[in-house]
């Protein structure tokens, strides 16, 4: 359903009671009795899964698609590993780490930007188009990887951090191609009517403040400028532990909202951002949703809300993607705790 997302952002900021907006999609496999492997290869199952999650969580502020950070890298030729009960992962780079610097630059320059429809991208685009027909009571967000997180997977995650210092020109070549692809991919989601996109840039959380601007922030800003408008929102996600010291880089993206992980103190983040900038977070997805209990989830949720809801721009959420096999008792406990807090 078409929505004015500038108005949505304004109303969310002004609402005294804010709906939680966790990154919740993969646990749909439990509601449907399927595997992750089946989910990531079938647009109908993805759309039905998003609808099942929406029906189970009437008080959620949005429907978020799969945070599958293997999709884009796979299009560039990166090998991935798929399991029945875990999120897919990239298991090897596209650029050989064993060749010399000049050769690596040649490989980077020869890297082709995939067409939209390569790999599983069309499945994911079709899934959002189908979900838009099924979910009409809240915004529907697509999910894509961020520029440095994609480039890092193509270059090898550990090596990419070294390349920022030792081979910055090569890193920028890969970043340019990653950014070009991400923009095309988001525009494909926009064309089929998605209300917005969550851009997941976790790898930027490993960069120092000076590098974060050059190798992530500037590219995220360019992506947002290309795709964001009054009918299409951008939510920027960074679950790194340096988000508190790279806030200038993060906020330069000019997104509608920013989503933070549990590696940072959410109250510290809130104290540092302008009061008109929506920030979301940050209940531990693994420690609480996956491995906690309903009581521990309740306590963690109330604790974060008690510290952060005094800031009018705070929205309670998970710290990152909620793992596929997280207990629905824990997920229900999270939403119940949000209701409990606002009922006080």
Task: Show which residues each predicted segment covers.
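Catalytic domains of carbohydrate-active enzymes, especially glycoside hydrolases
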Residues: 46-68, 188-195, 252-255
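A gly/proline- and charged-residue-enriched helix-loop-helix capping module
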Residues: 86-130
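Short, glycine/charge-rich beta-strand/loop segments that flank catalytic centers
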Residues: 65-75, 141-150
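Short amphipathic alpha-helical segment that frequently serves as the phosphate-/nucleotide-binding helix
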Residues: 44-47, 125
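Active-site loop/lid in soluble adenylation, ligation, and acyl-transfer enzymes
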Residues: 27, 31-32, 59-69, 74
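Glycine-rich loop at the start of a catalytic domain that most often binds anionic cofactors/ligands
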Residues: 70-86
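Active-site loop segments of alpha/beta catalytic cores
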Residues: 1-28, 36-37, 114-344
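Surface-exposed strand-loop-strand hairpins of Gram-negative outer-membrane beta-barrel proteins
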Residues: 34-45
């Amino acid at each position: 359903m078409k929505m004015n997302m500038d108005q949505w952002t304004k109303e969310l900021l002004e609402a005294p009671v804010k709906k939680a907006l966790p990154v919740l999609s993969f646990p749909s496999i439990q509601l449907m009795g399927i595997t992750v492997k089946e989910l990531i290869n079938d647009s109908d199952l993805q759309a039905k899964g998003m609808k099942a999650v929406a029906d189970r969580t009437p008080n959620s502020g949005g429907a978020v698609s799969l945070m599958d950070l293997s999709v884009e890298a796979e299009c560039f030729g990166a090998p991935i590993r798929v399991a029945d009960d875990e999120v897919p992962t990239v298991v090897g780079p596209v650029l050989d780490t064993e060749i010399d610097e000049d050769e690596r630059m040649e490989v980077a320059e020869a890297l082709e930007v995939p067409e939209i429809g390569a790999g599983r991208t069309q499945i994911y685009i079709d899934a959002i188009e189908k979900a838009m027909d099924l979910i009409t009571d809240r915004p529907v967000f697509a999910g894509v990887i961020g520029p440095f997180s994609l480039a890092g997977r193509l270059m090898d995650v550990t090596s990419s951090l070294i390349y920022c210092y030792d081979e910055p020109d090569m890193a920028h070549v890969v970043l340019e191609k990653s950014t070009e692809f991400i923009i095309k991919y988001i525009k494909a989601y926009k064309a089929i009517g998605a209300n917005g996109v969550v851009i997941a840039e976790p790898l930027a959380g490993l960069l120092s403040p000076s590098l974060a601007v050059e190798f992530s922030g500037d590219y995220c800003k360019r992506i947002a400028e290309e795709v964001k408008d009054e009918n299409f929102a951008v939510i920027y996600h960074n679950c790194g532990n340096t988000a508190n010291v790279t806030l200038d880089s993060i906020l330069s993206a000019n997104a509608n909202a920013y989503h933070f992980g549990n590696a940072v103190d959410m109250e510290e983040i809130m104290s540092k951002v302008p009061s008109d900038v929506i920030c979301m977070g940050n209940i531990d997805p693994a420690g609480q949703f996956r491995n906690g209990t309903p009581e521990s989830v309740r306590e963690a949720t109330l604790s974060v809300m008690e510290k952060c809801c005094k800031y009018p721009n705070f929205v309670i959420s998970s710290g990152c993607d909620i793992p596929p096999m997280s207990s629905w008792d824990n997920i229900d406990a999270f939403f119940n705790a949000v209701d409990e807090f606002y009922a006080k």
